[in-house]
């Protein structure tokens, strides 16, 4: 931060102002400071382009900002005892989780989602908000992360961006795209990039590897992470690409949530079962981890996923491992947030814990709640304790959260508003 300020990057004044405002906000449930994202000046047009003929001074500014972040990261090693919890903060869910309320004790990295690649190698920086408020939110998040000794990561892509990734990383646009990514990191003060290419089709493997190789060469000090899919044991994927990517990446995080559905041949199942799968319930965290390990990905590079949302099955299903009949998934990510589940569905009578799968669920005899659920699969403190114990026992790198916004209980007492992040702190980081 200090060296970046000295070289006069255009975005730093807003970042530093927010950092000062949030410097004492480490306990996420403390009273918020004055101001917030709305008080931070913008500084991006939401779609900046990188000029390949940019001046040497601009290039040096980018490099100097990278050096500054490298210096700052030297003090991060003790956070989490070498393990990580990276939480995704979705711009479109900003109202659900104020910046000043973030529970930093449960995080080592905050991934700001999403910057959208364009096929021509440029970026949409609006974060699903607009060209002014999106960048302002990003600057507030970066400042708050750094004020609390955590890393801020720019997440690129997301679901539905496959064609754009293919275009941006083609041989004719790759260099410009990497230039744009370097500029994004420098402009906002990010510590690195999360490369969310979904899906990675078999035909994409060569382009993905060439892109990540070039990106690592251009940004040797940056934190580079990549989320990847879970494994369906009935139809396992070729994971050989990830053993080649592992030396280039700091984290390979498995999106082991939302791993169930009303699919032909399936029974009802948990969103994120830790253990146990059979042909009718062919997903679990454990089976996905084993597949990536078998493909040659080092355990210390692997993170597992925790969804701060649930799945709602309609009746007649009322529990896991049941025949589906006419049941469907009627609500999931974005609607069935942990916050919504706790206020609209959770009761002591409805809650059960599947010890074999290490997963909680809610069971109802008839359609219940706003979505008419018969069976709700979700994460809670007990399942996250089991998941964290598994991470440690297997020597894995850590965990990711999709999304931290959905786990915030705004009406709970101070100190109890981010219980899932607190649970991950205890189980993964301590």
Model-inferred region functions:
Residues 1-2, 6-12, 16-80:
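Ser/Thr-rich, Pro/Gly/Ala-heavy low-complexity intrinsically disordered linkers and tails
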Residues 79-185, 318, 350, 416-429:
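Glycan-recognition patch characteristic of GH18 chitinases/ENGases
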Residues 86, 119-136, 197-341:
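Substrate-binding surface in catalytic domains of secreted glycosidases
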Residues 102-112, 169-197, 239-259:
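Structural recognition of alpha->loop->beta junctions
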Residues 106-107, 126-127, 263, 301, ...:
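Glycan-binding loop/region signatures in secreted carbohydrate-active enzymes
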Residues 110, 154, 195, 252, ...:
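Conserved, mostly hydrophobic/aromatic
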Residues 140-152, 187-190, 218-222, 248, ...:
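A structural motif corresponding to the C-terminal end of an alpha-helix
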Residues 173, 182, 186, 194-230, ...:
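Active-site and adjacent substrate-binding regions of carbohydrate-active enzymes
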């Amino acid at each position: 931060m200090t060296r970046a300020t000295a070289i006069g990057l255009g975005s730093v004044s807003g970042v530093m102002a927010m950092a000062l405002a949030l410097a004492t906000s480490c306990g996420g449930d403390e009273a918020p400071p004055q101001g917030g994202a709305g008080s931070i000046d913008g500084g991006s047009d939401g779609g900046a382009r990188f000029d390949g003929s940019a001046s040497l001074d601009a290039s040096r500014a980018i490099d100097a900002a990278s050096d500054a972040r490298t210096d700052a990261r030297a003090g991060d090693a003790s956070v989490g005892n070498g393990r990580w919890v990276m939480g995704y903060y979705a711009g479109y869910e900003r109202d659900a989780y104020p910046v000043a309320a973030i529970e930093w004790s449960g995080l080592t990295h905050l991934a700001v989602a999403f910057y959208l690649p364009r096929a021509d190698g440029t970026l949409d920086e609006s974060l699903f908000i607009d060209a002014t408020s999106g960048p302002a939110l990003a600057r507030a998040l970066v400042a708050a992360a750094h004020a609390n000794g955590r890393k801020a990561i720019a997440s690129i892509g997301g679901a539905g961006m496959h064609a754009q990734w293919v275009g941006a990383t083609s041989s004719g646009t790759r260099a410009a795209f990497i230039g744009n990514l370097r500029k994004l990191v420098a402009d906002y003060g990010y510590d690195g990039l999360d490369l969310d290419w979904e899906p990675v089709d078999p035909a994409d493997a060569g382009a993905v590897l060439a892109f990540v190789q070039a990106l690592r060469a251009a940004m040797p000090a940056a934190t580079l992470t990549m989320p990847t899919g879970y494994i369906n044991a009935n139809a396992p994927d070729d994971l050989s690409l990830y053993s080649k990517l592992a030396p280039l990446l700091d984290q390979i995080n498995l999106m082991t949530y939302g791993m169930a559905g009303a699919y032909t041949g399936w029974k009802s199942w948990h969103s994120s079962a830790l253990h146990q799968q059979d042909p009718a319930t062919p997903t679990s965290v454990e089976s996905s981890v084993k597949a990536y390990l078998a493909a040659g990905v080092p355990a210390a590079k692997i993170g597992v996923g925790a969804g701060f949302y649930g799945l709602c099955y309609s009746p007649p299903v009322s529990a896991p491992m049941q025949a589906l009949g006419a049941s469907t998934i009627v609500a999931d990510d974005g609607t069935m947030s942990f916050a919504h589940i706790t206020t609209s569905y959770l009761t002591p009578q409805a809650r059960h814990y599947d010890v074999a799968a290490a997963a909680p669920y809610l069971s109802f005899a008839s359609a219940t709640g706003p979505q008419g659920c018969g069976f709700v699969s979700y994460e809670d403190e007990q399942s996250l304790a089991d998941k964290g114990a598994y991470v440690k026992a297997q020597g894995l790198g850590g965990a990711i959260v999709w999304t931290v916004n959905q786990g915030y209980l705004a009406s709970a007492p101070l100190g109890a508003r981010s219980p899932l992040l607190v649970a991950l702190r205890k189980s993964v980081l301590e």
